[in-house]
Design a protein with these regions (language model features):
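Catalytic machinery of carbohydrate-active enzymes
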Residues: 1-256
């Protein structure tokens, strides 16, 4: 978005299909992005065609669409931007001030062990018990913070704040020293906030597509990777098994 704004400084942007917008809470407070119902208020409008079932990192093959995600290997994720409200920033600052008062001399790791309950996402699952093991083995050295919502599983030995929406989770992440989790929305947020991160990719999608070079991306390269299968996949499970608790711990320690 930043590069588009620099190229078209007098334009407003709508994320959508040319007819209707697909609004996301992540666009809130971004003055460059408008909703389609505001289209008559501006002269220069540019549509950004990035919405459900029309993602730039995917190739939509009708023959295989129901079976797997086909990745666009020419795509490379670029860091986005998040524009917080003063209330969101104050919320995050207050939470972290309290944590640092009680535990003043430890780095804080924002951890996200949960994943969406959607088709294909089980192939991104590293395993909740392994996340718990990472926390248990490093809790004396670092503070682990987990924001959660709804039916999310909550780790033990973490500081948890429950029923926190995505934007507030991102605001909280902005004050952390490191993000640790799977490939997904929060790792993109970490990049937008210039936060170091340990991101587990497994063998489902390649970090050259949706990863960031300044993150530590844990990916298993083999002849079937990145497979993109939507149903439960033995290959993806094997790749996740090859990424050990030790690998994640080592990456965290190196980045902190």
């Amino acid at each position: 978005m930043k590069s588009l704004q620099q190229k078209y400084p007098n334009s407003k942007f709508i994320v959508g299909d040319g007819k209707q917008s697909f609004w996301s809470e992540i666009y809130e407070n971004n003055k460059a992005i408008i909703d389609s119902n505001q289209i008559d208020d501006y002269k220069d409008i540019i549509w950004i065609k990035n919405y459900p079932n029309h993602r730039p990192y995917r190739v939509y093959d009708k023959k295989t669409h129901t079976i797997k995600y086909t990745w666009n290997n020419t795509f490379k994720a670029k860091k986005g931007e998040i524009f917080f409200t003063n209330q969101e920033l104050d919320f995050s600052t207050n939470v972290y001030s309290e944590i640092r008062k009680k535990i003043p001399n430890k780095k804080i790791v924002h951890i996200e062990p949960n994943l969406k309950l959607k088709k294909g996402f089980m192939n991104r699952d590293w395993g909740f018990e392994k996340w718990q093991q990472v926390v248990n083995e490093l809790k004396d050295d670092f503070v682990f913070f987990q924001s959660s919502f709804g039916k999310n599983k909550i780790l033990q030995n973490v500081i948890n704040l429950h029923n926190v929406n995505f934007r507030k989770s991102c605001a909280l992440l902005s004050n952390a020293d490191l993000f640790v989790g799977i490939e997904g929305g929060m790792h993109h947020a970490a990049a937008a906030l210039n936060k170091n991160a340990v991101v587990i990719f497994g063998g489902f999608i390649h970090p050259s597509i949706t990863g960031y070079d300044f993150h530590k991306n844990l990916y298993i390269e083999d002849e079937k990777s990145p497979c993109g299968l939507k149903d439960e996949c033995n290959h993806c499970q094997k790749c996740m098994e090859l990424i050990t608790v030790y690998d994640v711990k080592k990456a965290i320690i190196r980045l902190l």
